[in-house]
């Protein structure tokens, strides 16, 4: 069963910021996807989360790993693709060193016209041979527009030519002739002001460019993205003639040649055959009855949606762009219309792990992101309610922007070694501000080149550093270290005559054979009208798994594998037997693991949906700040439903009035939300 992050009410499966039942009517049935899956599948559901420094699974943290002591015995030296080195010390502690995992994901932040720097990053990736290794691209706002073009197979040179030559102002023009004429006249006056009034001309030009285009429908922008992405995909198909023999690829090519649009499903299929084409994730902000919720468009949620349409939605900068009305998407009810705003409102830096809480069988990272965020966005987080400017922004946008930015920046700290800050404060000026960067749609070509060169240098430096970086992990035993390795790493160790690695490989092979038998038993029952029950065939499988769990490390590995995201059948079984008396140690451990994951996701979303929006409302007194921080601390360590409810009850019982002479609020969104988020024990 998919772990949901909401109270047990209906839920829109597209959203990543779920609403409790008191705040929003049901929009769809609960998803049955498993927990902790890849970004592409997880973004279809509502378990997207933004968390502080990737809060640890406290319930699964054991005593601190002892420090290595005594002499070290080298078990393996620089083996395998990641040049793994494994040592064992006299006190039994094992130490693992290996190179960084492959770079497979590019994350592009929103920033309006600041995105003019992005061609520098793509050039650096291409020059360093890293672009083809990128398998997915994720973008918000202007980053979503960039991601759509790049995921279509556009190379660094093509992208720079398009980006540098794109007249962003004209792409915001109205389709009505008289209105468009007025907009062009204002632009020409602005150009003259810039030329003849050096002190105030730039600002005047900006105002005359933007104000006449406020609430633009930006249809020309969507058309450019549609046309250019189609051209890029067709160019890649032509460059790989061998793939045209695939009927599905030929069908896509025919559709595009007839004027059709590139869809998310097209990119997913083509990415399996053409490395230059990537899977794509683009954020949008859905305004459900005034309540903002993040939606991530991708091949899992919206396979038939035009990527140009999604990029238009994501780039709909508040006030400047008119909200985009969307209907007939898989996550919408029949006849439902939803207004969308800029994807950066809810998450401007859409890092996969900040959207989908990853649960793994190993602490070792299997892949890396390259995260591009713009200089000047860090700031220092206040400890409470937004200042006037932040409160005004929240009101204008209709979303808790201040709280979301702080959540985002705290979560990004956990990905610092995967992040490159786009340089915007240079000797040629400060392009990190709203007027100097975000809305500077008439940025001169020499400035664009300058910013691109700076970013090229920054990304190249990052790639050079990560190529020589080594990660180090310490484990309490050699068994724990070996169980943290993937099969390829274990095979490399076994080839170096590591008998223990061979034993772990054999254990996994035997376990997977039993897993297959268990799956057959579950599928067989699913073919009958009766509810899933724990039968003799399943009981036999778990008896075999119990025998394989010859030590705590192997039992833990089995429990986590049974909770693996890709196996819906095992998830279904664990949900069916939860709450029943269980004899199998492995099954009991797997159920406990599922419960810990459920609680972790729910607790994190309470922090995101209840605590932070309340914490950053204007006028919070010290008592409320202390209360909310205490609840946050408790939720970070919660492993049971009772502990989650205890933290919520603390808020319900002690939350005070803001800016009022009386102590208790007459009505409170925070208290009502806390009540709605209580979960069954």
Could you tell me what each predicted segment is?
Residues 29-107, 284-290, 634-646:
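Small-residue-rich anion-binding loops in enzyme active sites
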Residues 208, 246-360, 436:
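Active-site gating loop/helix substructures
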Residues 48-70, 89-98, 156-198, 381, ...:
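Extended charged low-complexity segments that act as oligomerization/scaffolding linkers
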Residues 350-377:
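A short alpha/beta connector and helix-capping loop motif
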Residues 231-251:
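Short secondary-structure capping/junction motifs at helix and strand boundaries
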Residues 347, 374-376, 397-681:
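C-terminal helical/tail subdomains of lipid-metabolizing enzymes
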Residues 1-37, 41, 679-681:
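Non-Sec secretion/translocation targeting segments of pathogen effectors
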Residues 62, 82-83, 90, 99-107, ...:
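Patatin-like phospholipase
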């Amino acid at each position: 069963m998919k772990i949901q992050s909401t109270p047990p009410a209906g839920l829109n499966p597209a959203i990543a910021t779920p609403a409790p039942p008191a705040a929003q009517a049901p929009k769809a049935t609960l998803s049955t996807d498993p927990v902790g899956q890849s970004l592409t599948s997880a973004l279809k559901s509502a378990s997207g989360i933004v968390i502080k420094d990737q809060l640890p699974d406290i319930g699964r943290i054991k005593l601190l790993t002892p420090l290595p002591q005594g002499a070290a015995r080298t078990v393996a030296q620089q083996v395998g693709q990641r040049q793994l080195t494994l040592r064992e010390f006299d006190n039994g502690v094992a130490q693992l060193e290996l190179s960084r995992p492959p770079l497979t994901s590019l994350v592009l932040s929103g920033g309006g016209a600041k995105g003019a720097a992005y061609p520098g990053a793509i050039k650096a990736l291409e020059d360093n041979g890293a672009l083809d290794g990128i398998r997915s691209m994720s973008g918000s706002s202007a980053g979503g527009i960039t991601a759509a073009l790049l995921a279509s197979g556009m190379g660094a040179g093509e992208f720079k030519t398009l980006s540098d030559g794109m007249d962003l102002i004209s792409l915001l023009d109205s389709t009505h002739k008289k209105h468009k004429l007025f907009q062009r006249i204002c632009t020409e006056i602005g150009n003259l002001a810039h030329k003849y009034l050096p002190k105030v001309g730039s600002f005047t030009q900006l105002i005359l460019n933007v104000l006449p285009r406020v609430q633009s429908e930006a249809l020309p922008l969507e058309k450019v993205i549609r046309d250019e992405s189609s051209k890029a995909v067709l160019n890649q198909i032509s460059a790989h003639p061998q793939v045209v023999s695939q009927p599905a690829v030929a069908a896509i090519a025919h559709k595009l040649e007839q004027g059709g649009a590139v869809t998310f499903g097209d990119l997913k299929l083509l990415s399996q055959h053409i490395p230059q084409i990537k899977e794509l994730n683009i954020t949008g902000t859905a305004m459900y009855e005034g309540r903002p919720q993040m939606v991530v468009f991708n091949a899992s949620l919206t396979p038939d949606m035009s990527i140009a349409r999604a990029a238009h939605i994501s780039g709909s900068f508040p006030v400047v762009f008119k909200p985009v009305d969307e209907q007939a998407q898989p996550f919408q009810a029949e006849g439902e219309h939803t207004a969308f705003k800029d994807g950066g409102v809810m998450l401007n830096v859409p890092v996969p792990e900040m959207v989908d809480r990853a649960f793994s069988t190993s602490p070792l990272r299997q892949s890396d992101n390259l995260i591009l965020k713009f200089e000047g966005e860090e700031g220092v987080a206040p400890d409470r309610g937004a200042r006037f400017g932040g409160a005004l922004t929240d009101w204008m946008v209709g979303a808790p922007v201040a709280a979301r930015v702080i959540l985002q920046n705290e979560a990004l700290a956990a990905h610092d070694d995967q992040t490159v800050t786009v340089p915007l404060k240079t000797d040629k000026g400060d392009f990190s501000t709203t007027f100097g960067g975000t809305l500077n749609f008439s940025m001169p070509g020499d400035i664009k080149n300058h910013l691109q060169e700076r970013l090229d240098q920054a990304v190249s430096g990052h790639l050079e550093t990560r190529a020589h970086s080594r990660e180090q992990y310490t484990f309490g035993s050699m068994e724990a270290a070996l169980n943290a390795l993937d099969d390829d790493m274990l095979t490399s160790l076994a080839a170096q005559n590591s008998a223990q690695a061979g034993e772990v490989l054999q254990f996994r092979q035997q376990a997977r054979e039993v897993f297959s038998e268990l799956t057959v038993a579950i599928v067989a029952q699913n073919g009958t009208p009766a509810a899933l029950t724990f039968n003799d065939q399943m009981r036999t499988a778990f008896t075999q798994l119990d025998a394989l769990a010859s030590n705590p490390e192997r039992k833990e590995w089995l429990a986590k594998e049974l909770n693996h995201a890709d196996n819906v059948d095992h998830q279904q079984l664990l949900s069916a037997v939860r709450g029943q008396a269980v004899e199998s140690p492995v099954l009991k451990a797997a159920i406990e693991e599922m419960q810990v994951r459920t609680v972790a996701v729910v607790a994190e979303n309470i922090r995101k949906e209840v605590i932070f929006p309340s914490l950053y409302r204007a006028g919070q007194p010290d008592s409320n700040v202390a209360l909310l921080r205490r609840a946050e601390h408790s939720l970070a360590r919660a492993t049971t439903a009772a502990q989650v409810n205890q933290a919520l009850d603390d808020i319900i019982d002690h939350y005070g009035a803001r800016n009022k002479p009386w102590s208790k609020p007459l009505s409170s969104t925070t208290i009502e939300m806390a009540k709605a988020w209580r979960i069954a024990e």
